[in-house]
Structures are given as C-alpha cells and as structure tokens.
A protein has these predicted regions:
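Interdomain/boundary linker segments immediately adjacent to catalytic/signaling cores
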Residues: 1-23
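Active-site metal-binding core of divalent-cation-utilizing nuclease and nuclease-like domains
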Residues: 25-76, 114-125, 133-140
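Nucleic-acid nuclease catalytic cores
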Residues: 80-131
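Extreme N-terminal tail/first-helix region
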Residues: 1-9, 130-142
Length: 142
C-alpha cells in the first residue's frame, strides 16, 4: 500500500530536519513554525500557517480547530517543543483532528532536545465507511 502524500511528506520531513539543525531547542513554538513554513515554501509547496478549519455537527459549524501549518491543502503539521513528545494524549488528540477534518495526513513534529516526528493518517474512505456503519459516528464530519 502506497503512503498517502508520500512525496510531500518526505519533503516536509527534510525541511523539518533542516530547521532542527539550525534552530536551537528552547525557542518559542512560533519561531519553529515560521522557519518551517519558509523552508517548505522554498521547496515550492503551498503553505498556510495558523489555519482555522471549520468543524461541523449536523451540517452546522460548531467551532474551529487551529492547525499550525497546512501544506498543499493536504497535510496538517502540528509543531511541538516538549520533552515528552510522543505521548498517548498528543497522539489521541491528533487522531481526533484527522477524524474531524477532511485531511488524511498529520505530521507531529517535535523541536525538542532531539528532533522527532510522528506521521498519522486516516483515509477519508475509512471515515466515510465508519459513518455509514454508524460506528462512532457523531456527525462531526462535514
């Protein structure tokens, strides 16, 4: 099975490691977001920062989620700067972001003492299948 958005993801990860080599640990998250966004743009991708995405319930907008970076309107990037980066709470929250949005791929990027990342995916086909079965369906998908 081919990875979703494999080439874009590979380029984003290259940018991530480029930024992580240059910027030291301990800066405010916004520095990493801005540097990463600039690096990804230089690779000729469309980048949106601090993107608000509508969340729906029964065809009504009930709120918005704020994503650090969206690349090519296809991939969510969440930036972190913590010591305990890959913990279950962050992963579960990220899965919810994928479930509630039309995006299928999310990269958790940690600019901690050691650069680390996690790639999560949830296909829209799977989301639709779950909705049609009524399994966990809560009407939150647009």
């Amino acid at each position: 099975m081919e990875l979703l958005h494999k080439n874009i993801t590979a380029s984003i990860l290259q940018s991530f490691f480029n930024v992580a080599k240059v910027l030291p640990f301990g800066l405010d998250k916004s520095f990493y977001i801005n540097a990463l966004a600039n690096d990804i743009r230089q690779a000729d991708f469309s980048v949106q920062t601090n993107k608000l995405v509508d969340i729906f319930y029964n065809d009504n907008v009930i709120g918005q989620l704020n994503f650090d970076i969206i690349v090519n309107d296809a991939i969510i990037i969440k930036v972190d700067t913590s010591f305990d980066f890959i913990n279950n709470e962050r992963q579960e929250k990220s899965k919810i972001y994928l479930k509630l949005s039309h995006y299928e791929v999310l990269l958790l990027l940690n600019f901690g003492q050691e650069a680390d990342y996690k790639r999560l995916f949830l296909s829209n086909d799977y989301k639709q299948l779950q909705q049609s079965r009524g399994s966990g369906s809560n009407g939150l998908l647009p």
